[in-house]
Amino acid sequence: MQLISASEGDTPCCHRPPPPALLKGIEEFNQHAYFECHETLEELWNQERVGRRRHQQSPHRSSLASGCDNLYKGILQVGVGCYHLLRRNYHGATVKLQSGADYLEPFAPVCMKVQVAHLIADARLLRAELVALGPDHFTEVDLALLPQVRLAGSTQEE
C-alpha cells in the first residue's frame, strides 16, 4: 500500500491551521524543553484521538474523521528521543527518533504548516550519527544536530 502525502490531500487535518497547543509544543521543542513539549503535545494528541473516536461513532460522520493525532505523536516522540539523548540513554534516543520519524511519514512534506519532511530528515540524521558513534561514544554527538521544528512561511524557514 502506498501512502499519499498530506500535501496531496490524503489527510484533511493538514489543511487546518495549527492549534495554539501545537505552536506552544513546537516552541518548547525548539527550546529543548522536551519534557514540557511532551506534556503539551500528549494532551493535544489525546484530545484529537478522543474527538476522532467520538466523530467515528456518530451516524453523521464525514471523511474528516482523519485526525492529526499521529502528527502530534510523531513530533512528541522525536522530542522524547532528544530528551533521552540529553539524559545519556542511547537505546531510548535511537528508538524514539526512529518511531517519531515513522509516525510523521504520512504527513510529509507539510502539515498544519509544520515542515514535516525537514523534521523527519533531521531526526533520521541525528539517529544515524548516534548509531555511527555507537552506545559507547554516542554522547560525543554534535548537539547542533538536535532537530528543530520549522513552520512553512515563518522567518525560521530556510
Region spans (language model):
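Hydrophobic/aromatic side-chain positions at a characteristic register within alpha-helices
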Residues: P17, L22, F29-N30, L85
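TPR/TPR-like alpha-solenoid helical repeat scaffolds
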Residues: Q56-L71, P109-V131
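Alpha-helical linker/edge segments of TPR/alpha-solenoid repeat scaffolds
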Residues: Q77-H84, A121-E140
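TPR/TPR-like (Sel1-like) alpha-helical repeat modules
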Residues: Y90-A108
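A hydrophobic membrane-anchoring alpha-helix module
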Residues: L133-E158
